[in-house]
UniProtKB/Swiss-Prot annotation:
Gene (name only): PETH
Gene Ontology BP terms: photosynthesis
Record-listed FAD binding positions: R142, L143, Y144, S145, S163, V164, K165, Y169, V180, C181, S182, T221
Reactions catalysed according to its record: 2 reduced [2Fe-2S]-[ferredoxin] + NADP(+) + H(+) = 2 oxidized [2Fe-2S]-[ferredoxin] + NADPH
Protein name as annotated: Ferredoxin--NADP reductase, cyanelle
Taxonomic source organism: Cyanophora paradoxa
Any one Pfam family match given in the protein's UniProt record, by short name: NAD_binding_1
Compartmental location: Plastid, Cyanelle stroma; Plastid, Cyanelle thylakoid membrane
EC number annotated for this UniProt entry: 1.18.1.2
Membrane topology type: Peripheral membrane protein
Length: 363
């Protein structure tokens, strides 16, 4: 998932580069990937056809968690690495995560950063593809939402994961056009180096309230930040964080074969039925009560009263991530719900934004 954006500079970012403290490694509960148990980097090494020997990916038992308490300190890691001086990470895993016959290809990619690029759930990193554009200038960085918790997929604070869909389309002249960065990333092999910038972003950070209701609206690779949310909530055990609220994910995709992390999500939901609700909107396979294609807004409409009542509560937070086209349908749905409750959505969403309870990142 990629979008190009200007990156603002925030104060207090550099402190996280030098401050490090030893903490207990987070215990991973029910850790799995593509339905299999995951305990260390060696799992990913064994899954990747071109992976180097597992010894290359041994987990260091001394954990440095630079970003763990960032929000409590009032510090959010931002712009630690810039385009002029990126961090050089390495790909250690790159595998397809869509089913057979899926339209398009999406990969789960893991990079090492050896604790040098701390980040928080909801942030993004920049990737600079090698080479130059048609004008001979270096390629611009692309931003990708992070799909792993701050501790990475192995809980050792040394990796960062992305969900990347390969961009390919035919233009008006019948020429095949390939996205520069997405194709570069999807073609990486374990051991390949990659230029990383960031982290960036404060819009999609998780709320600190551990009893909050968190509603997540995602399409396609927009699932990335919510995978990081959910893994922090339900797969890691922390002395200072225990989620006991409600997480409700609406995931919109065209076909069942494009449900990213399906086994992972359903396993978490089954293990946490009182704290995690999961609803799919599969547009090419499902219809609503009116016989219309099932998009996220159609699924939300089925829970209109419940959804409305939830967002009236001060500890309910709504997050939206995915293709920009999802916004119009959800906007219309919310306007209809607000009207049925005697008000306007413009007034409601204005209040939600003021209270920092409505968060949108689309591309």
């Amino acid at each position: 998932m990629a979008f190009v954006a200007s990156v603002p500079v925030f104060a207090n970012a550099s402190g996280l580069k030098t401050e490090a403290k030893v903490c207990q490694k987070p215990a991973l509960k029910n850790s799995f990937f593509r339905g299999e148990e995951v305990t260390s980097r060696s799992f990913f090494a064994s899954q990747a056809v071109s992976a180097k020997p597992a010894t290359t990916f041994e987990v260091d038992t001394t954990i440095r968690a630079q970003a763990v308490d960032a929000k409590k300190k009032g510090d959010i890691p931002l712009n630690l690495f810039r385009p002029a001086n990126p961090y050089i990470g390495k790909c250690i895993y790159n595998e397809r995560i869509v089913g057979e016959g899926a339209p398009g290809e999406t990969k789960h990619i893991i990079f090492t950063h050896e604790g040098k690029v701390p980040y928080l759930e909801g942030q993004s990193i920049g990737i600079i593809p090698p080479g130059t554009d048609k004008d001979g200038k270096p390629h611009k960085l692309r931003l990708y939402s992070i799909a792993s918790t701050r501790h990475g997929d192995f809980g050792d604070d040394k990796t960062v994961s992305l969900s990347v869909k390969r961009l390919e389309y035919t233009d008006a002249n019948g020429n095949l056009v390939k996205g520069v960065c997405s194709n570069y990333l999807c073609d990486l092999k374990p051991g390949d180096e990659v230029m990383i910038t960031g982290p960036v972003g404060t819009t999609m950070l998780m709320p600190e309230d551990q009893s909050a209701t968190i509603i997540m609206l995602a399409t396609g690779t927009g699932i990335a930040p919510f995978r990081s949310f959910l893994r922090r909530m339900f797969e890691e055990t922390h002395a200072d964080y225990k989620f006991n609220g409600l997480a409700w994910l609406f995931l919109g995709v065209p076909t069942s074969s494009t449900l990213l992390y399906r086994e992972e999500l359903e396993k978490m939901q089954k293990a946490n039925p009182n704290n995690f609700r999961l609803d799919y909107a599969i547009s090419r396979e499902q219809t609503d009560s009116k016989g219309e294609k099932m998009y996220i807004q159609n699924r939300i409409a089925e829970y209109a009263n419940e959804f409305w009542n939830m967002i009236q509560k001060p500890n309910t937070f709504v997050y939206m991530c995915g293709l920009r086209g999802m916004e119009d349908g959800i906007q219309q749905c919310m306007e209809d719900i607000a009207k049925a409750n005697g008000t306007t959505w413009d007034a409601v969403v204005k209040g939600l934004k003021k209270e920092k309870r409505w968060h949108v990142e689309t591309y």
